[in-house]
């Protein structure tokens, strides 16, 4: 037991409120962590002893880290906004501390929080803004009690769409996917979440218009979310024919089939890379948008409502650089960056899915919808933040004793320094 106590990592709990106290209780018998005290911004709590732990001000942090060999800080502030959390992270990162966080306040108050709920800081915290809250009426409008089909249902966007959809109580959910394993995986996940909903898995190529029309007619589909696409810029650049076939022809087939079988709503998932495209992927998605708008113009008397949604980069999606950066940091670096000034817009996968659903409820005339994602993010700053949040220091000319190096490798063919969301007033 003495040896085990020596191997424990010393931690501080940031937040001496209900969440922090619940966490200290949960950590009492932890074989891995030993609580040294609380940190809190409330002056009235400083120097008080709660549950046997002293409450310290942030001004004492440097001394605490040095004298107690602190490894981690657990954020027990589940109700604070993202800006405040970012400010706290910046302060903690000065001391090379690994920051971990907790789930919602309701789970803590209800006593449902356990030591296993402690996790690494959420990747969503990389956004320099709070998450955009959805309109509940819009979420329900085209889904509740209706038959929904999602193409690319096994992908990162498609699967999150499905997770959001099943919460809105559709009549049926059809999962259309060409990748067998991806289809199996999302089907298994969704059937566990909702055992009562009729979920149908369809191993189908979205370019097959005849098969699509059969499906739309057989199941009387009300709403289609077209998420199937190839998204990796460099791969599509090297596989132009397949990229165009999958991204453009599938949109044509879906749009024609939707009109022919009187589907009520069709939503195309597009990208900010479709704006003044400089690569094949962006061009293929812009062409997909034009196909949707062209088919709408040709079939104005149709009962099918078309809408288009443009995304920025979705955090932790299959096409995002974030998982790659995380892997490089975990392996000790270097983290590769194409250009020191490259910027991107970012959104969470939840925001992305909710935007798609709301756009489908608002769209009628093949309008293009975009999410207000605030200011674009400088990728170099994002990498530095990720390195710091992981408990490491950036190694550069100013700090040769740092842990992780950032290596500039040059822009890839077709890659922009910055993205736009709209072309003029389109």
Locate predicted features.
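Conserved Rossmann-fold cofactor-binding substructure of NAD(P)-dependent oxidoreductases
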Residues: 203-223
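A conserved pocket-lining segment of Rossmann-fold NAD(P)-dependent short-chain dehydrogenase/reductase
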Residues: 301, 324-347, 351, 355-379
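A solvent-exposed beta-alpha-beta segment
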Residues: 2-108, 181-187, 192, 199-200, ...
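Flexible, Lys/Arg-rich cytosolic regulatory linkers and terminal tails that connect or flank
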Residues: 46, 53, 58, 85-147, ...
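Mid/C-terminal beta-alpha module of Rossmann-like enzyme folds, strongest
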Residues: 362-426
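Active-site Tyr-X1-5-Lys
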Residues: 253-264, 277-306, 318-331
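N-terminal Rossmann NAD(P)H-binding glycine-rich loop of SDR-like oxidoreductase domains
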Residues: 148-166
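Conserved Rossmann-fold NAD(P)-dependent oxidoreductase catalytic core, especially the SDR/UDP-sugar
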Residues: 110-111, 226, 230-289
């Amino acid at each position: 037991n003495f040896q085990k106590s020596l191997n424990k990592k010393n931690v501080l709990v940031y937040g001496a409120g209900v969440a922090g106290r619940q966490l200290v209780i949960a950590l009492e018998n932890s074989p891995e962590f030993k609580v040294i005290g609380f940190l809190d911004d409330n002056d009235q709590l400083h120097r008080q002893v709660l549950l046997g732990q002293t409450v310290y001000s942030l001004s004492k942090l440097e001394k605490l880290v040095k004298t107690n060999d602190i490894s981690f800080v657990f954020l027990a502030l589940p109700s604070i906004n993202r800006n405040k959390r970012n400010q706290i992270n910046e302060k903690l990162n000065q001391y090379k501390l690994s920051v971990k966080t907790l789930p919602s306040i309701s789970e803590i108050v209800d006593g449902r929080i356990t030591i296993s709920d402690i996790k690494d800081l959420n990747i969503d915290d990389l956004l320099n803004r709070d998450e955009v809250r959805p309109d509940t009426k819009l979420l329900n409008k085209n889904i509740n009690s209706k038959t929904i089909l999602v193409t690319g249902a096994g992908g990162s966007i498609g699967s999150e769409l499905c997770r959001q959809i099943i919460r809105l109580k559709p009549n049926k959910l059809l999962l259309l996917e060409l990748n067998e394993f991806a289809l199996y995986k999302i089907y298994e996940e969704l059937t566990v979440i909702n055992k009562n909903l009729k979920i149908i898995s369809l191993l189908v190529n979205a370019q097959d218009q005849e098969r699509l029309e059969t499906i739309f007619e057989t199941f009387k589909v009300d709403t289609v979310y077209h998420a199937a696409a190839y998204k990796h810029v460099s791969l599509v650049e090297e596989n132009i024919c397949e990229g165009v076939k999958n991204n453009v022809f599938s949109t044509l087939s879906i749009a024609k089939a939707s009109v022919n079988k009187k589907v009520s709503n069709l939503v195309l998932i597009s990208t900010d890379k479709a704006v003044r495209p400089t690569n094949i992927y962006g061009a293929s998605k812009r062409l997909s948008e034009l196909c949707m708008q062209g088919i709408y113009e040709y079939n104005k008397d149709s009962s099918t409502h078309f809408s288009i949604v443009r995304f920025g980069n979705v955090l932790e999606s299959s096409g995002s650089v974030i998982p790659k950066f995380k892997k490089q940091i975990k392996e000790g670096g270097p983290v590769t960056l194409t250009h020191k000034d490259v910027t991107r817009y970012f959104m969470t996968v939840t925001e992305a899915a909710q935007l798609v659903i709301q756009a489908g409820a608002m769209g009628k005339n093949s309008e293009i919808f975009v999410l207000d994602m605030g200011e674009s993010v400088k990728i170099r700053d994002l990498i530095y933040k990720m390195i710091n949040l992981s408990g490491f220091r950036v190694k550069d000319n100013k700090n040769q004793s740092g842990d992780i190096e950032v290596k500039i490798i040059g822009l890839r063919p077709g890659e922009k320094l910055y993205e736009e969301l709209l072309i003029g007033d389109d």
